[in-house]
């Protein structure tokens, strides 16, 4: 299976936000971490992400986010590792009060 198909399969684990006009996917915390592990294997950079909360059947931003800019002297591998590390640290350390109702919008890649 090629890389794009593998990415598409991973994204299906999340909730598409396309109907809300957002070209991205929301994942539960544990699923987001699993996707990050697989993205690292596929060499997919993570540029950042946002936290969305499911409220009354609608995803709403809570305006918490993270980002990772590439350094000018960074190799692809260095940036990959650092971008995944920053994403994982944010997600693992993020305190979600309502775990089942909260989603982390992950992928700006």
Where are these regions (language model features)?
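Long, contiguous N-terminal structural blocks used for assembly/anchoring
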Residues: 1-27
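Short coil/turn linker and secondary-structure boundary residues
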Residues: 2, 27-30, 74, 82
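Exposed alpha-helical structural elements
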Residues: 6, 31-34, 86
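Structured alpha/beta or helical-core interaction and ligand-binding surfaces enriched in interleaved
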Residues: 22, 29-35, 41, 47, ...
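Ordered hydrophobic segments in well-structured contexts
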Residues: 26, 45-53, 103-108
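Short secondary-structure junctions
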Residues: 39-45, 96-99
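Acidic, low-complexity, intrinsically disordered interaction modules
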Residues: 44-89
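Amphipathic alpha-helical binding modules
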Residues: 77-109
